[in-house]
Structure formats: C-alpha cells, structure tokens
C-alpha cells in the first residue's frame, strides 16, 4: 500500500498549520479520495471513511454557524474523534475555537489554504493521485517524441540511451534513462518519470554520465510523461520473423493496462532514432483513425476485385 504524508502535502500545496501536532510530518495519507464532511457534521457517520482528508469549505462553515454553541462543539468533536489524517479549511476562513481545541486534544492536524474549495480539491486530488498510484520500476528509457511518450525497453547495451541521445539532438525530449518509474494514475493512463536521483541524466558508454538539462537546455527534458507506446529493442535474430506489414497490433500489459508495443530488431547500420520517430508518428496516426497497413490491404482487395470482374 502506497502512502504520502501530511507533511508532504503541506510543503507541496503551501498549507498553513493552525495547530502544532508532534507527528505531523509522519502522519500517513493512504486514500486519494477526499471528503467534505457535511453529513458527518449532522451526525451521520455510516459509511464514513476515516482514511480520507477532510475538507471544510464555505458551505460547511456556514452550516456550523447555524448551530448553537453546544451543537457546534459536539459536531466538531465527533469529527476529530475519528482517526482522520487531517482537516483542511479552505478560502482562508477563520476556524471556530472548537476546531483548534479538538485538533490539539486528539492530535489531528488542522490546516488552512487561501484557495477556494473546488480549485484546492482539484489540486490536492491531482497530487494524491500521483503519490498514491500503483507503480513499478522498469529498466528502460522514456522519451517524448512528437508528443508521444515512447518507452524503450531492451537488454543492457542494446542502444536505448544512444537512441535517446540522438532523439534529443533531433529536438525531442528526454524524460528518464536507465530506470523508469511507471505509475497507474487512472484505469487507462500510465505515467513514467525518472527517480529523482538520476533525473535528467543519461549514461553513454565510453563517455559516462551526461546532464542533458545542462548540455542541451531545459527544453530538452521533462519530469514526467504519459506512456503511449512501448518499443522493445533487441539484437537482430536471423531465425526470427519480424513484423513487416503492421496489420496486427501488439500490446504489452503494464500494471493491468495494455499499451501498444513494437519489437524493433537492432543491427549495425540501422538508424534507430529515425525508426523511433516514425513509429511515434505512426502510432499517433493510428489513434487518429488511419492505419497504413489496413489501407494497403483494402487497396489490394479493391484491385483484386476489379481484376476479377474483368
């Protein structure tokens, strides 16, 4: 189970701490969903998920203002009695004294943001989706080629890094080399990025480690990219039949998501950078509804039909 911490969302989203809680940096958040506790403030806790961050917006605060002091005190205490990660007040609203009191009493962090509720929840949800997404690390290289995220896989020494370097020279964007952290951010989307320690670095045998950002400029690197195509590079095997028409799409499954894949044989003299460029453009063209192999097949069928009629 992946998790992030309250301390991390404070730093990432620039939140204000309204109370001092000793374990705030280590307090875990394990659920990417958020909750606005309107029903809970009314006393209804059935199906209440304690692992969710609680958001107090203008509506919730307005409802609390309609209560008597005793009712409000009871409602707020019942919320803080639960083992929730934290409570966040939006729109820079002033909290009732009871929020501060029970935050300290039960050790629940009370935070505040100046952003309006909807915008803040969108930003927080995006951050939590990234942090809590299922993930794996694969040995490979990820490059943005004509807007397509291309993940190159293959055994060590097959030419992934050299191909990526040539692509960068041709104006494309490096995302990760050697190790790619892949996250499943939705049921249909995989996003890859480099581990922070090797971000923007590339290893070229015979030269060593290169800093692509410093060598080629910030326009040649990117922190993360959606994975649209997987290219598997392998040494050319004379006894193996490789795809020549492209009629049958192949897929590789990563974290339960099927991604289009191509197997590209490598041998001296082949310009892999151009092949990867064309593969990326062809994949994009297929997503737009045109398949050159199928168009050729249909053209041949029409020609054969005309010849038969003659």
Curated annotation (Swiss-Prot):
GO terms for biological process: regulation of carbohydrate metabolic process. It catalyses: [HPr protein]-L-serine + ATP = [HPr protein]-O-phospho-L-serine + ADP + H(+); [HPr protein]-O-phospho-L-serine + phosphate + H(+) = [HPr protein]-L-serine + diphosphate. Its cofactor is Mg(2+). Coiled coil: none annotated. The active site is at residues 139, 160, 178, 244. Belongs to the HPrK/P family. Catalyzes the ATP- as well as the pyrophosphate-dependent phosphorylation of a specific serine residue in HPr, a phosphocarrier protein of the phosphoenolpyruvate-dependent sugar phosphotransferase system (PTS). HprK/P also catalyzes the pyrophosphate-producing, inorganic phosphate-dependent dephosphorylation (phosphorolysis) of seryl-phosphorylated HPr (P-Ser-HPr). Both phosphorylation and phosphorolysis are carried out by the same active site and suggest a common mechanism for both reactions. The Walker A ATP-binding motif also binds Pi and PPi. This is HPr kinase/phosphorylase. It comes from Caldicellulosiruptor saccharolyticus (strain ATCC 43494 / DSM 8903 / Tp8T 6331). The gene is hprK.
């Amino acid at each position: 189970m992946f998790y992030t911490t309250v301390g991390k969302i404070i730093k990432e989203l620039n939140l204000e701490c309204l109370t001092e809680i000793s374990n705030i940096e280590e307090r875990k958040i394990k659920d990417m969903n958020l909750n606005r506790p309107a029903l809970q403030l009314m006393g209804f806790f059935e199906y209440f998920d304690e692992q969710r961050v609680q958001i107090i917006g203008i509506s919730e605060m307005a409802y609390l203002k309609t209560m008597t002091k005793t009712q409000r005190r009871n409602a707020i205490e019942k919320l803080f009695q639960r083992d929730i990660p934290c409570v966040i007040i939006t729109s820079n609203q002033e909290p009732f004294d009871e929020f501060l009191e029970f935050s300290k009493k039960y050790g629940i962090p009370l935070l505040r943001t100046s952003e309006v509720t909807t915008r803040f929840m969108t930003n927080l949800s995006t951050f939590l989706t990234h942090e809590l997404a299922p993930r794996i690390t694969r040995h490979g290289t990820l490059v943005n080629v004509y807007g397509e995220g291309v993940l190159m896989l293959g055994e060590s020494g097959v030419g992934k890094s050299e191909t990526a370097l040539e692509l960068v020279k041709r104006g494309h964007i490096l995302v990760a080399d050697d190790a790619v952290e892949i996250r499943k951010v939705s049921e249909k989307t995989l996003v890859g990025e480099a581990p922070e320690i090797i971000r923007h670095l590339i290893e070229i045998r015979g030269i060593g480690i290169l800093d692509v950002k410093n060598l080629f400029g910030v326009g040649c690197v990117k922190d993360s990219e959606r994975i649209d195509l997987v290219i598997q590079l392998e040494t050319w095997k004379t006894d193996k039949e490789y795809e020549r028409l492209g009629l049958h799409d192949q897929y590789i499954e990563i974290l339960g998501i099927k991604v289009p894949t191509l197997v590209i044989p490598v041998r001296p003299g082949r310009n892999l950078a151009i092949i990867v460029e064309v593969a990326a453009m062809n994949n994009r063209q297929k997503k737009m509804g045109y398949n050159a192999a199928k168009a050729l097949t249909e053209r041949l069928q029409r020609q054969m039909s005309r010849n038969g009629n003659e």
